[in-house]
Structure formats: structure tokens, C-alpha cells
């Protein structure tokens, strides 16, 4: 076959291969449609009803559920809790994760084992993790009070304390997911060329100066990824709270996710639960978008 014939043959076949690729998008598009778009639309419609979640009979109530949401004092208390979990977990996961990454990026003998130990809690179910810590903090027979008893200290009911249990939840969430932040930061650190540090040392820059002038600016993409992921995960925290306190005492440790669960299954108030769900979705969307925009701008400024 001549060169011209081969060229013509290739040109005829190539468009057919390209045109067939759109079929590959169908499974992903169907998954998004069935598991994301349809539930969101259905949930939005439920917010305009007084459906109890089980009966086939319900009434359209217009915007009554939204009026109820904004006038309900529980909404704002639980929003404050949710922001506490989301922003608190994000702060501690990133600070501790970065410290772990800086330490384990050094040439130390046990760094492989230490990385595994730090990352191991990520592989445990959040619900199981919550029950593990429940048995540690439990008032009756908990490991913490047994330890305090050895030193003659009176037992404390930490999980029933409205001032303590939100911080315990943040601590557990940080402990479980700090390994993800560490891995992302390690990847970012290992992508920084060593030539930059060698040049800085030759110029007499100390380690602190190298961190703020080289490491931190070049880690900004990793920081952006971690911040956004941690905020989204923290704002929809559910399993650990259910295992530890079930949102109690009262609504002291409720998050928006656990409050929705409580409304739907315990109070049989599906219309209001769906309204809280839509509200939570917009809170997460707005905060994560603002965080992404802010840190993307910081990336540009520090590059």
C-alpha cells in the first residue's frame, strides 16, 4: 500500500475511534443522575410538604418549612456546632498533618512504620472509631476514669459535658483523618526540588527562613486540597457523633447531619429534615467554595 493510501486510511478510521468515546461517559452520567441529581431534586420537593417519611398521605405547605427553619433556635445552635466540627477539625488536621509530614520527610529509620501507624486509623470505620473512643471516655467502666482512679482522681462524665464533648469529637475526627493530610503534604514536600534548599543554604538562609520562603509557598496546592477536603468532611460529620453522644445531652453535640437523622427517624418529620438537608448542602457549598477561592488566590500570590 502506498504512503498516500495509508494516510487516507488513517484519516478515515481516526474520526470513528474518536466519535465512539462518548459512550464511555454514560455510566458516570447515569450514576450522577441517579445518585446525586435525582435525590437532590426529590429532597427539594419534600421540603415543600409535611410528609412524615412513612405515610402515603401528605400536604403541600409551601415555604412553611423554610420559615420554620430560620425561626428555629435549634438551627443556629446546631449550625454553630457544625462549624465548630468542620473548622476545628480542619485546623488541627492540617497543623498536625503538616508537622507529621515535615518530620517523616526526614531521613529517619522508622519513618515507614510511623507513616503506617499514623495512616492506620483512616482505614477504620468512623462508627467503629466512635465506639472505641466511647469505651475510653465512658463514665461507667471507661478506660479514662479507671486511669484517673489509679491516681485517686474523681471520675468525670466527659461525654455528658456540653463544654467538653464537642472538643472530644474534634479530637477524634482529627486523630482518625490526620493521616490523609499527612500523605498529601508528604507528596507536596517530595515534589519540591532539593536544589532550592541547597541554594538557600549557600545564601545563608536558616531552616525557618527556608520554610517560609520555599516550603510554604510551594506547598500551597497541597494546603488548598487538604483544607477543602477537611472542611467538607468535618461539616458533614455523622458517624462519630452517633456512636459517642447521639447528639446529646439534649442537642449539645448535634451536627446538622445527626439533627436530620433525628428529625426523620425519631420525630418522623421528613419535610423538615429535608429542609435542614438543603440548608446543610448550601452551607457546605458556600464555605468550601469560599475556602477554595481564597486559597487559590493565595497560591497565585505566593507563587
Curated annotation (Swiss-Prot):
Induction: Repressed by the transcriptional regulator MelR. Induced by melibiose and raffinose. GO terms for cellular component: plasma membrane. It is a multi-pass membrane protein. Keywords: Cell membrane, Membrane, Polysaccharide transport, Sugar transport, Transmembrane, Transmembrane helix, Transport. Residues 79-291 form the ABC transmembrane type-1 domain. The keyword Signal does not apply. PROSITE patterns: ABC_TM1. One of its GO terms (biological process) is polysaccharide transport. The chain crosses the membrane at residues 21-41, 83-103, 117-137, 167-187, 210-232, 275-295. Part of the ABC transporter complex MelEDC-MsmX involved in melibiose, raffinose and stachyose import. Probably responsible for the translocation of the substrate across the membrane. This is Melibiose/raffinose/stachyose import permease protein MelD. It comes from Bacillus subtilis (strain 168).
Amino acid at each position: 500500500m502506498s504512503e498516500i493510501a495509508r494516510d487516507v486510511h488513517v484519516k478515515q478510521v481516526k474520526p470513528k475511534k474518536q466519535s465512539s468515546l462518548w459512550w464511555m461517559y454514560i455510566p458516570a452520567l447515569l450514576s450522577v443522575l441517579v445518585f446525586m441529581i435525582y435525590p437532590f431534586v426529590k429532597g427539594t420537593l419534600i421540603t415543600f410538604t409535611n410528609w412524615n417519611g412513612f405515610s402515603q398521605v401528605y400536604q403541600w405547605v409551601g415555604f412553611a418549612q423554610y420559615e420554620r427553619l430560620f425561626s428555629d433556635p435549634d438551627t443556629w445552635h446546631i449550625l454553630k456546632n457544625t462549624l465548630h466540627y468542620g473548622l476545628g477539625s480542619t485546623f488541627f488536621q492540617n497543623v498536625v498533618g503538616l508537622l507529621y509530614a515535615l518530620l517523616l520527610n526526614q531521613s529517619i529509620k522508622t519513618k515507614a512504620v510511623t507513616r503506617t501507624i499514623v495512616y492506620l486509623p483512616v482505614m477504620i470505620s468512623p462508627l467503629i472509631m466512635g465506639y472505641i473512643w466511647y469505651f475510653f471516655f465512658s463514665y461507667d467502666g471507661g478506660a479514662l476514669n479507671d486511669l484517673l482512679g489509679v491516681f485517686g482522681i474523681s471520675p468525670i462524665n466527659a461525654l455528658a459535658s456540653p463544654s467538653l464533648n464537642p472538643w472530644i469529637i474534634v479530637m477524634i475526627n482529627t486523630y482518625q483523618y490526620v493521616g490523609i493530610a499527612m500523605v498529601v503534604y508528604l507528596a507536596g514536600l517530595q515534589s519540591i526540588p532539593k536544589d532550592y534548599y541547597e541554594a538557600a543554604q549557600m545564601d545563608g538562609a536558616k531552616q525557618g527562613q527556608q520554610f517560609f520562603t520555599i516550603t510554604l509557598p510551594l506547598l500551597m496546592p497541597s494546603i488548598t486540597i487538604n483544607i477543602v477536603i477537611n472542611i467538607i468532611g468535618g461539616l458533614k460529620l455523622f458517624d462519630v457523633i452517633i456512636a459517642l453522644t447521639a447528639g446529646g445531652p439534649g442537642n449539645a453535640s448535634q451536627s446538622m447531619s445527626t439533627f436530620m437523622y433525628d428529625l426523620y427517624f425519631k420525630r418522623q418529620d421528613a419535610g423538615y429534615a429535608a429542609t435542614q438537608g438543603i440548608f446543610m448542602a448550601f452551607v457546605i457549598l458556600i464555605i468550601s467554595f469560599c475556602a477554595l477561592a481564597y486559597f487559590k488566590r493565595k497560591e497565585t500570590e505566593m507563587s
